[in-house]
């Protein structure tokens, strides 16, 4: 405390977060490793701050963020949720610069942690899609809660929130741009129905400017493009072009939104016990190494739902690299960083085991 500080001064009421040494972390190897990176055909893992590595990574189809929660969970985590926007800001800025129109962000956090970061994500062009709840069940808090003294309901959940890019063309949303291009052709709106071979679906769905707007499937988009370029005003050609020289193809159009395939039988509540058993990475003494290690099945769930084989997955805050490992199992490319040397070392061992198992097949 400063000798000149007043009893109610901000320097007393709000101190900078202290080190997390001794809080939650069970392994301190204190070893100078002879490596700081690991890679194979699918995965690139780095020891260090992801802010120093983003520029070397391929553009992401998916970003899986499992960083600061505001609970002093690791060295550098904030002491509460209030400082989380400042902690995430440089990362979100970097993600936004690297993202492509089809990028999906899966943002893991506590409810309040996500809530305070959400406005920042919107500011940088990320559109909220859905909030998914990981329900760990009562077993997660069994024997650890005194219901006679607790002043709230016990917490057994985390959130994994889905965001996509708010794609714009010349500062117009996609639905506004589609309508503008058709009007620019000079053709009446009803002719779009002729182009698509429908009664009224084109004008009713593809050109709607409200909540009923429907992203035109590849085939229908190509029909609109071909019709406008064949029958539209010659002075405005090509229509539906990003560069003014060539119209978008159907394949290019399909990449203007994120990928998602909903697996059968799943909802936005994932009832799955906290991680135990062989998958939980432990020290030689048998203690769980990383308190926030995510289950592989949940990581595989979001990766598989929002990517295809050989797509790129970013895991900026690797921990034990669960997202990268899930991506590798699904034949996706993964780029990940972990700033803590001990977590990095143990995380890499998971991949050494995986490679060894593959060699036995």
Residue ranges with predicted function:
Residues 343, 352-353, 358-360:
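Conserved phosphoryl-transfer catalytic core
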Residues 1-25, 31-336, 342-344:
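Core catalytic lobe of class I
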Residues 347-348:
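Conserved SAM-binding loop
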């Amino acid at each position: 405390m400063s000798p000149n500080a007043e009893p109610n001064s901000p320097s007393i009421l709000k101190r900078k977060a202290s080190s997390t040494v001794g809080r939650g972390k069970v392994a301190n190897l204190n070893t100078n490793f002879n490596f700081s990176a690991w890679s194979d055909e699918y995965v690139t893992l780095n020891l260090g701050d992801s802010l120093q590595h983003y520029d070397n990574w391929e553009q992401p189809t998916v970003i899986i963020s499992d960083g600061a929660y505001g609970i002093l969970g690791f060295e550098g985590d904030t002491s509460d949720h209030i400082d989380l926007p400042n902690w995430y800001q440089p990362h979100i800025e970097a993600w936004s610069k690297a993202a492509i129109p089809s990028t999906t962000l899966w943002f893991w956090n506590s409810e309040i942690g996500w809530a305070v970061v959400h406005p920042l994500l919107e500011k940088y062009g990320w559109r909220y899609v859905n909030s998914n709840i990981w329900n760990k069940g009562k077993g997660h808090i069994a024997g650890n809660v005194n219901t006679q003294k607790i002043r709230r309901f016990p917490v057994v959940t985390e959130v994994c929130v889905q965001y996509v890019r708010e794609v714009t063309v010349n500062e117009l949303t996609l639905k506004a741009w589609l309508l503008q291009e058709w009007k620019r052709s000079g053709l009446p709106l009803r002719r779009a129905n002729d182009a698509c071979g429908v009664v009224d679906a084109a004008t009713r769905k593809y050109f709607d400017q409200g909540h009923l707007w429907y992203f035109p499937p590849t085939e229908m988009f190509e029909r609109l493009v071909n019709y406008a370029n064949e029958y539209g005003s010659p002075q405005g050609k090509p229509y539906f072009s990003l560069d003014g020289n060539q119209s978008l193809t159907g394949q290019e159009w399909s990449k203007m939104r994120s990928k998602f395939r909903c697996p059968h039988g799943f909802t936005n509540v994932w009832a799955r016990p906290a991680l135990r058993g062989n998958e939980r990475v432990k020290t030689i003494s048998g203690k769980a190494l990383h308190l926030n290690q995510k289950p592989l099945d949940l990581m595989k769930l979001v990766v598989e739902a929002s990517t295809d084989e050989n797509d790129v997955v970013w895991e900026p805050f690797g921990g034990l690299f669960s997202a990268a490992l899930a991506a590798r199992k699904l034949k996706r490319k993964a780029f990940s960083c972990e700033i803590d040397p001990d977590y990095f070392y143990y995380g890499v061992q998971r991949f050494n085991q995986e490679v060894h198992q593959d060699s036995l097949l």
